[in-house]
Amino acid sequence: MDFQLKTLTVARAAAEKSDVLIVLVGSAPLTAKDPLSALIASARKAGDLPDKAGKLLALYHPDEVVASRVVLAAIGDGKPASVRSGVIAAVNAAKAYGPKRVVMAFAQEADGAAVGSAVAAAADASYVYTTTKAKTSNGENGRTIRHLTLGVADAAAVGTAFDEARATVAGIELAKEWGNRPGNYCTPTLLAEAAKELGKLPRVKCEVLGPKEVQKLGMGSFAAVAQGSAEPLRFIVLRYQGGPKDQAPVVLVGKGITFDTGGVSLKPAAEMDEMKFDMCGAASVLGTFRALGEIQPAINVVGLVPSCENMNDGRAIKPGDVVTSMSGQTIEVLNTDAEGRLILCDALTYAKRFEPAAVIDIATLTGACVVALGGVRSGLFTSDDSLAEALQAAGEQSQDRCWRLPLDDEYAEGLKSNFADVANVAGRAGGAITAAKFLQRFAGDFTWAHLDIAGTAWKSGAAKGSTGRPVGLLVSYLMERARSGAAQAVSPKKAARKEPGAAARKARSAQ
């Protein structure tokens, strides 16, 4: 969708050429006296447009309005969550008219957060997946809304927020695209090709490692998962450099299982098709880099994506097999369907070479997290309170929320093995937590967080499809880090290398 930002009052929005005009109406009084504002005020007074966010009133050919159809949408207090509810309801209603051009205007003042929420919600409500669909007789099968003009009281005041939101939407839609693709349209090789395309963006570089390079690195755990598939594995390394070279990067690690049968520990047939979504962690990393390449914030970011299929041919790993990870730790594979942690652990070890300021892994990791949190919030695991607060704040800002879960050491008891350094599963109880405890073993001493997006990465049923989460959360976190100056931190090792020796300090003091 093509977005445009303009300074528009309600009266000026009424004069804009469009197929549908959407007016976002907050609970504050309307003071304008133009015909449409007066009509809105009358509708509110009569109770036809309640203040509750998401309530709608549709009008046909109101006086002095160019658009033939007008949708009034309540946004309540005007906060991001309320704006999102109102915009999604309004855009869904507008789609019934088959419009190509829509004008959407705030009736009252709107800040940057409200504008960002409106852009994200409009894109979300109008998104249509088309890659594997045939075109209709008129040559169209995608979203009907091609152009949306967003009207605000002062476009200059919210321009930066609008630009960031538009870039974030591009990242979310890239994540949706690759999440929605079936396994034969999204192999590790094809995913790596998509990453290489991102390498053409400003300040973004991409490197792709294959089976030989992965074996040479000693990534025995990752390679073991991949060995049951005819599709070769790929290890994707993305780098965005918006800060100085000595700035410690944030490393994002995305699980890239492009299809998960469960391996020898075979999944049930029902809903196995949804295991194409098991690479949504990887898709979120690609989507985040898509946004970074457009926004170009002053921060350094590394993206790591271990990608393979989890299949079950004669070469596949078996329950009871012991594999050696890149860290040197051995792992007893008690369940081959707990493969995500087996590929992530090697990527976490690889992340250490970047001397990161923080590492965040993103994975559709456990059904237990779905049971705990449903599809509303992603699970957040970290022992670092500052990182937890920053990620939770980013989730609230972007309406891509997460919820922190515990990491008590007692949860790791079930991971003990008689035959290896650690087992890859620990029983049913607290499954999301024990999976996070497994990953924590490989995070070393750097600041680390794990986002379990098994409940939030896609929807099932009639609305089946990728959500693009948590691209919004990740971009919001990185942007706030860049703005706050936290991104300027130099890694401790690099700082130590820069520190002059005692002899040099003594010589200077004698001068």
UniProtKB/Swiss-Prot annotation:
Region annotation (Disordered) ranges: 485-511
Active-site feature positions: K267, R341
Name the UniProt record assigns to this protein: Probable cytosol aminopeptidase
Coiled coil, from the record: none
Cellular localization per UniProt: Cytoplasm
Source species taxonomy: Bacteria, Pseudomonadati, Pseudomonadota, Betaproteobacteria, Burkholderiales
Residues the entry annotates as binding Mn(2+) 2: K255, D260, D278, E339
UniProt-listed InterPro entries: Leucine_aapep/pepB, Macro_dom-like, Peptidase_M17_C, Peptidase_M17_leu_NH2_pept, Peptidase_M17_N
Organism: Variovorax paradoxus (strain S110)
